[in-house]
Amino acid sequence: MLTYLVYEKQQKLKIMMKMQGLKDGPYWMISYGYFFILSVVYMTFFVIFGSLIGLNFFRVNSYGIQIVFFFVYINLQIAFAFFVASFFSSVKIATVIGYIYVFGSGLLGAFLFRFFIEDINFPRGWILVMEIVPGFSLYRGLYELGQYAFSGNAMGATGMTWENLKDPINGMRDILIVMTVEWALMLVLAFYLDQVSSIGGSVGNPLLFFRCLQKKHAPPLQSSFVQQNHKVAVDMEKEDVAQERQVVEQLLMDSNANQAIICDNLRKVYPGKDGNPDKLAVRGLSLALPKGQCFGMLGPNGAGKTSFISMMVGLTKPTSGTAYAHGMDIRMDMDNIYTNMGVCPQHDLLWETLTGKEHLFFYARLKNLKGAALVKAVNDSLKSVNLFHGGVGDKQVGKYSGGMKRRLSVAISLIGDPKVVYMDEPSTGLDPASRNNLWNIVKEAKRNRAIVLTSNYDSFPCPLMHLHHRLSCPPFYCI
């Protein structure tokens, strides 16, 4: 469980799912339910097999107590995995720490914790404190079941029953209480840490989490020049830059403005490290993009293209300024923006064990496609990126070439008819024929949506663009 959760963070698959419209609640319920079902199936076979081969541990003790004990522990184990996963972004480190915990708690439980349990002079309060560790609480429960099974078998009687929970020397009742309380607390803490943690590339904000519990009211469209009282050095701007900025200001003052994307003085500064100065990546970007148009950015690495995309898709927060997608503020309404947004990230975020078709089915369902419309959308997407014929779409993504993965990422960004699409260097790794096919796909797709493209190549398809900007050096400040 731990490695599975951390893997999705490390590969940024969780972020990708969120950007395609999967909310945190359904993600948690689906993941929790998946782990719970697997654990219940495993534990059921474990108990049945132990009973069939005649182990007194299972046969003598009450099955009702065993069911309750294993049920509570399974839920505690899942909550604990979610909690611990919030501290890791590397599968290797998480796996090593996980094995150390399992073997360490097992060895300490068998040699040290058991000694404390059987020592009548050892304070019972300290036993309860030690049982906060899930591994020790599991060992204590198994120890009690084992002791009652042994004594019951020796005396020809039953093992642990519900009546035995009242025995002063029986620690099972305390164990069940401790694990139940810890399960609830661990689940709340795990969800909180998941929301506020920035580990794994997501944006974390403790205050934002508490705001999410309240009803959100996005501020009205208003120029950040008014909000920040920020004066721009106009003499540094070219004529077309100044004109676009004026257009944005006018649109922000118009309550009936219907633009797919409006960027208002969007700015991103990365703090300097090791004594280096701050890095200005995006300086005062103002942009208005209506539906049916495509905006392209061309420039070298470090010009601010990915920084701009990252702010627009919610991976990083703007230092100042803001942007609106169909009137929704990226600072407050990202969850709503995600439902109408498609993203082709700079690096392919895919499951190696799933097929291309399974990827598209999954993301299409997130966009509420069902039935015949779902199947048609998936097949059309595979055909558009040349992954349909020859059964390519039914092969695992791990067997795809780099270009095939890139084409699949493009298909994912367009499935479900998103109203706004961001493609960060979508032509990377594509041969000339595939690149030309990509531009044809974009040309067809832009009719019903606004598209933002970035690229490093001089072969950027300027005829496709209604607006484009060439970045000779960072920072990117306006079109």
Question: Residue ranges of each PLM-predicted region?
Answer:
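Acidic-residue sensor for enzyme active/binding pockets
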Residues: E8, E237-E239, E244, E358, ...
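ABC transporter nucleotide-binding domains
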Residues: Q259-L464, R470
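H-loop (His-switch) and adjacent beta-strand-loop-beta switch element
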Residues: L467-I479
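ABC-family P-loop ATPase nucleotide-binding domain
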Residues: L189, L193-K279
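Membrane-spanning alpha-helical segments of multipass transporters and channels
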Residues: M1-K14, Q20-S224
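Generic alpha-helical segment signature
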Residues: V6, Q77, N256-A260, L374
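Flexible, active-site-proximal loop/turn residues at the rims of small-molecule/cofactor binding pockets
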Residues: G33, G272, P474
